[in-house]
Amino acid sequence: MSTFMANKGNIERKWYVIDAAGKPMGKTAVVAADLLRGKRKVTYTPHADCGDNVIIINASKAILTGNKMEQKYYRTHSGWVGGLKETKYRILMQEKPELAMRVAVRGMMPRNTVTKDSLKRLHIYAGEAHEQQAQKPEAYEV
């Protein structure tokens, strides 16, 4: 009997919706990253993109524990000298909560080419409404 190896022909992708309201951003990001990679499937293969589609709603209502709203920064760099831009998470959560959640999920994923394809299946919304009703996503508890 040979070992099962997942490939594009034998992967079944499901849709999951995660409600982030009142839950820590890190715990929500860990669950989303595991679903995107397919680590909670029996057919998980590390080198293959065998994960599911994930929808995160209420990203603006996710919580950061401790003083992270004031002490944690989102940093980007343009590549030029003096091109570092810093934004406190308090401001980032008010203006772009989807970006804050995407950065958290990306930080929980490995740094490889499978991650790039997996993150394309991540859909994040600040509010409760989402556009993927036709896919009939299953609710997933954190």
Where are these regions (language model features)?
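Internal, active-site/partner-interface "lid" segment
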Residues: 114-134
